[in-house]
Amino acid sequence: MKKTRTANLHHLYHEALPEDVKLTPRVEVDNVHQRRTTDVYEHALTITAWQQIYDQLHPGKFHGEFTEILLDEIQVFREYTGLALRQSCLVWPNSFWFGIPATRGEQGFIGAQGLGSAEIATRPGGTEFELSTPDDYTILGVVISEDVISRQATFLHNPERVLHMLRNQLALEVKEQHKAALWGFVQQALATFSESPETLHQPAVRKVLSDNLLLAMGTMLEEAKPIHSAESISHQGYRRLLSRAREYVLENMSEPLTVLDLCNQLHVSRRTLQNAFHAILGIGPNAWLKRIRLNAVRRELISPWSQSATVKDAAMQWGFWHLGQFATDYQQLFAEKPSLTLHQRMRQWA
């Protein structure tokens, strides 16, 4: 009898884990991973020990690239995404994540907080957060376990102050030269060990790399400070409104929601909702609702854990009752017919 796969494809897993369960990546071989991706669902699964759900917001064929190094309780990576995304993320527990965006190009957001040239994102492990990233976006990531920070606290002059910021801030303002130095160090490490991954099998090499990374991080964090956002209060409120709207849509998958439903649930007028979507995303709430639902259908079609056996099953589950129009809208967003998406899953996981 074939085993049935089950999973929630549209929400992250938040159940409390026993204290003796450790999810910290710790490896001595297979330290380096490189991947090229052509689908947002596939790309969201690339980062070791993370939970992620991505929604593709701009139409086109997605292209992503990902490189990571796994050290002893430290994770370093570079992520490139070709199209604008909305991301739900959850880092492995008992750690701190640092997101270091490029200093040039259109900025991304963590929650309602913009990430400019002198800013980095940060979140404790086990805490869900949301990223919004534009087309053609590169971000570096560093994840350090709390145990490493505790054992190596000397790399911070004032660890209590820094830890307080890391636990309570979505983003930090840092000196541009410190951010640039860390960016260069991480890029060089990724390039070097991607070409010679076997070098990281040596404990001495891993130790030197880890220690130098901690020193570079310490230099940046010592002079970091909370951000006083330049974005207007109204725009920050709009971003929070969009986040609440998405959660409501995904929590009510049994019925096709409308703009009126969103207004009633979020206690805002239609004009406020329109203003929020146009100010932040440049599209109306109707178009956004359709894209979020199309992304949900795509996860149902492509995931090996899906229970949907046909395109019709997946489409009807998310309120697309006119299958011809659904297929047209799906192909416009993902540059691919829904039947092809399902065929790829069946061929790979049959």
From Swiss-Prot:
Pathway: Amine and polyamine degradation; ethanolamine degradation. Induction: Part of the 17-gene eut operon transcribed from a single promoter, positively regulates its own expression, induced by ethanolamine and adenosylcobalamin (AdoCbl, vitamin B12). This is the last gene in the operon and has a second weaker promoter that is constitutively transcribed at a low level. Subject to catabolite repression; expression is substantially lower during growth on glucose than during growth versus succinate. Catabolite repression is overcome by adding exogenous cAMP to the glucose growth media. SUPFAM superfamilies: Homeodomain-like. GO terms for molecular function: cis-regulatory region sequence-specific DNA binding; DNA-binding transcription factor activity. GO terms for biological process: ethanolamine catabolic process; regulation of DNA-templated transcription. Residues 260-281, 311-334 bind DNA. Keywords: Activator, DNA-binding, Transcription, Transcription regulation, Virulence. InterPro entries: AraC_XylS_family_regulators, Homeodomain-like_sf, HTH_AraC, HTH_AraC-typ_CS. Residues 243-344 form the HTH araC/xylS-type domain. It holds the Pfam family HTH_18. Gene3D superfamilies: Homeodomain-like (1.10.10.60). Transmembrane segments: none annotated. PANTHER family: HTH-TYPE DNA-BINDING TRANSCRIPTIONAL ACTIVATOR EUTR, HTH-TYPE TRANSCRIPTIONAL ACTIVATOR RHAS-RELATED. Activates the transcription of the eut operon, allowing utilization of ethanolamine (EA). Positively regulates its own transcription. Probably binds EA and vitamin B12 as effectors. Competes with ethanolamine ammonia-lysase (EAL, the first enzyme in the EA degradation pathway) for adenosylcobalamin. Ethanolamine-associated signaling mediated via this protein, but not EA degradation, impacts S.typhimurium survival within macrophages. Binds the promoter of ssrB and eutS in vitro; in mouse infection models binding to ssrB probably induces all 4 operons of pathogenicity island SPI-2. This is HTH-type DNA-binding transcriptional activator EutR. It comes from Salmonella typhimurium (strain LT2 / SGSC1412 / ATCC 700720).
